[in-house]
């Protein structure tokens, strides 16, 4: 049997397409209706895609390569623009420059810098080594770090700024009396205030050891831990001020309180001072169990420390470390011992009794008065830290303070071990930027006390990660009035700020008031507070109505007032 296979049903048939032959040119002979009246301009595939206008044929600033992007097909006028005067669409445009908000200023600054920056392997650029690794030279690394900080400051990039906490919680029953902003306080001036007149002097001072003037980076000396008691007694707890208030003066304070008020325009952190008005007399006090006596670190820096409290580089822990260093340094540089000579004032230390056998720090108290005009007489307790014997035999009283270096990389500062011996001015200038408020308060205290010299010590950590061991790298001395001029500190302005606050309180009724620096704004506020406020702060547990009392983080000594 045979089968016939029909292959015609399995394969499709081929139909010849109709080909149009255009004798006059190329392309189709007939144009569909959908493409009629559509302008056409010849183009080249080499032309840039997405260009809106053809600028290359009209003007070109680069004469050497004026035909660099030119095309023979881009000269048509199908898409040319012809201006027609149509006044119906005419309207005015506001050409005033719009002020950008602060968070948008400098957004594209780094983009502009990257366009004009140097290329790879060029001078100041990147150095490329094998295996695809890119490194920076040591000089370029140091030069790049400040630029990073500037980008964060001016471009507002990175995390938002950390809000500081107030030194005391403002309560609902406090009445705000006055707000004083810094621009207004800076303009105040009270000239022609004479040097204070001594009322009485107390305490005992030890003599300065001149061998510490020869210390340098190559001949450093370890900082010792000296177990001595330092009294930080407030105004109303001072028995001498209580005695003097009966006959002399109508405004009473300590040098630390006065320096805080006088240098308030340089402060960034929050602080508070309690003021009591009794009749025509004013008493300025600091609250107990607070951080008023702690020394701030990098308070006025562009990037102040913001670590957590658990870190040794947190603002509070750095302040405790700086206070610990300052107390120990001021006692170590003195000639100690029973056989060494001492300078004794008229009266003994008013804060210890004769039967107490304790080691007290070398401090001399000078009670002085100033006449501020309008029957205002200020009485304050000032302090000296040491005394220096001159060749003529006359003693020179010293105010001894210490600057501390904690981590130059984190603090955006200069390394003391590299710059202190050769460029001490650069180190001091950097400290004036980072610790302007602290240095100003030290200077004011030295001027008020009448110190002949202000001794500054440079103390650094042995290891940046170890906050318990330090070394002395050098010392420097200044005359207080000359140093005040050098750091642009005006005593006339300082007296003006103090007089302004005194006048405000004098106008109020008798009672208790509180002056506080706003933690995040350059403003000082004066509050009228109830008379029983902060009375519970004197309890034995050290806790007041503001919560937990002041406690030391590091156990530098057994007593909170010891060093």
Curated annotation (Swiss-Prot):
UniProt keyword annotations, A-Z: Cytoplasm, Initiation factor, Phosphoprotein, Protein biosynthesis, RNA-binding
Record-level GO BP terms: cap-dependent translational initiation; formation of cytoplasmic translation initiation complex; regulation of translational initiation
Gene Ontology CC annotation, any one: nucleus
Subcellular location(s) per record: Cytoplasm
Segments of skewed composition (Basic residues): 100-121
GO molecular function term, any single one: mRNA cap binding
Region of interest (RNA gate), residue spans: 291-305
Pfam families (UniProt xref): eIF-3_zeta
The keyword Flavoprotein belongs to this UniProt entry's keyword annotation: no
Source organism superkingdom: Eukaryota
Residues passing through the membrane, by range: none
Record InterPro entries: eIF3d (IPR007783)
Assembly description: Component of the eukaryotic translation initiation factor 3 (eIF-3) complex. The eIF-3 complex interacts with pix.
Family: Belongs to the eIF-3 subunit D family.
Swiss-Prot/TrEMBL domain comment: The RNA gate region regulates mRNA cap recognition to prevent promiscuous mRNA-binding before assembly of eif3d into the full eukaryotic translation initiation factor 3 (eIF-3) complex.
Name listed for the protein in its UniProt record: Eukaryotic translation initiation factor 3 subunit D-1
């Amino acid at each position: 049997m045979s089968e016939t296979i029909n292959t015609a049903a399995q394969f499709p048939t081929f139909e010849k397409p109709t080909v149009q032959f255009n004798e006059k040119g190329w392309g189709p002979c007939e144009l569909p209706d959908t493409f009629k009246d559509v302008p056409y301009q010849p183009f080249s595939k080499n032309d840039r895609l997405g260009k809106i206008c053809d600028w290359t044929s009209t003007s070109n600033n680069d004469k050497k390569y004026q035909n660099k992007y030119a095309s023979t097909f881009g000269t048509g006028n199908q898409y040319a623009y012809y201006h027609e005067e149509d006044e119906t669409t005419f309207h005015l445009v506001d050409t005033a420059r719009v002020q950008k908000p602060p968070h948008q200023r400098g957004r594209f600054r780094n983009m502009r810098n990257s366009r004009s920056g140097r290329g790879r392997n060029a001078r100041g650029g990147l150095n490329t080594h094998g295996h695809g690794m890119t490194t920076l030279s040591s000089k370029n690394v140091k030069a790049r770090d400040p630029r990073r900080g500037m980008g964060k400051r001016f471009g507002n990039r990175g995390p938002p700024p950390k809000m500081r906490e107030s030194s005391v919680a403002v309560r609902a029953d406090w009445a705000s009396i006055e707000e004083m902003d810094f621009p207004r306080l800076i303009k105040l001036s009270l000239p022609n205030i004479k040097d204070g007149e001594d009322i009485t002097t107390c305490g005992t001072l030890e003599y300065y050891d001149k061998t510490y003037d020869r210390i340098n980076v190559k001949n450093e000396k370890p900082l010792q831990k000296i177990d001595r008691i330092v009294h930080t007694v407030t105004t109303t707890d001072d028995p001498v001020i209580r005695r003097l208030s009966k006959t002399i003066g109508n405004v009473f304070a300590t040098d630390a309180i006065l320096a805080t008020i006088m240098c308030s325009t340089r402060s960034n952190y929050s602080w508070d001072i309690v003021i009591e008005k009794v009749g025509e007399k004013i008493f300025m006090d600091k609250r107990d169990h607070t951080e008023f006596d702690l020394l701030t670190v990098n308070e006025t820096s562009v990037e102040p420390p913001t670590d957590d409290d658990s870190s040794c580089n947190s603002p509070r822990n750095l302040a405790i470390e700086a206070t610990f260093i300052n107390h120990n340094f001021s006692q170590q540089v003195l000639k100690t011992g029973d056989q060494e000579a001492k300078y004794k004032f008229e009266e003994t230390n008013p804060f210890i009794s004769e039967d107490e056998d304790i080691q007290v720090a070398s401090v001399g108290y000078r009670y002085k008065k100033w006449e501020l005009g309008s029957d205002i007489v200020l009485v304050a307790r000032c302090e000296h830290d040491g005394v220096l014997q001159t060749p003529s035999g006359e003693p020179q009283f010293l105010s001894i303070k210490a600057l501390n270096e904690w981590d130059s990389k984190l603090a955006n500062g200069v390394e003391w071990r590299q710059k202190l011996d050769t460029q001490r001015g650069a180190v001091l200038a950097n400290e004036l930027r980072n610790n302007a408020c602290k240095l100003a308060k030290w200077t004011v205290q030295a001027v008020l006390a009448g110190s002949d010299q202000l001794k500054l010590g440079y103390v650094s950590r042995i290891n940046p990660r170890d906050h318990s061991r330090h070394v002395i790298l050098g010392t420097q001395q200044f005359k207080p009035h000359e140093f005040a001029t050098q750091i642009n500190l005006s005593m006339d302005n300082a007296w003006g700020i103090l007089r302004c606050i005194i006048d405000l309180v004098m106008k109020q009724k008798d009672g208790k008031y509180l002056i506080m620096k706003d933690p995040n704004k350059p403003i000082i506020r004066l509050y009228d507070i109830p008379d029983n406020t902060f009375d519970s702060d004197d309890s034995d547990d050290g806790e007041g109505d503001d919560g937990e009392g002041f406690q030391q983080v590091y156990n530098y000594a057994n007593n909170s007032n010891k060093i």
